[in-house]
């Protein structure tokens, strides 16, 4: 089905269907969670492999192709109950999730995403904001 790219109707369709999107940052791993088409997706980064928990059934997916803004999230679907999975059914870039929250421009050089409430473990997509060189840029429309 291809990669969802910024500035396309694909992102709009995905976010019209995805709900409860949240980012969680822990000491040794990161997760992105969302509901999509009746199933809860939970992607876990442990540095090398990314695990997708699809309706309680774990499956290994491809590692992100690079770090931070250019990461790729591979969503897979369960084909049957014999642990056979269809890979590459949908790919969503983590950067695209951020774009959908902040707008259609890339992050300014030297910027990164922070959680406004200071707690990544309970940070929803609406609590994300841009931080540049250690100075919060609240109100930035990106």
For the regions a protein language model found, what residue spans apply to each?
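Acidic catalytic motifs of isoprenoid enzymes
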Residues: 116
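Conserved recognition-core residues within compact binding domains
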Residues: 2-110, 119-142
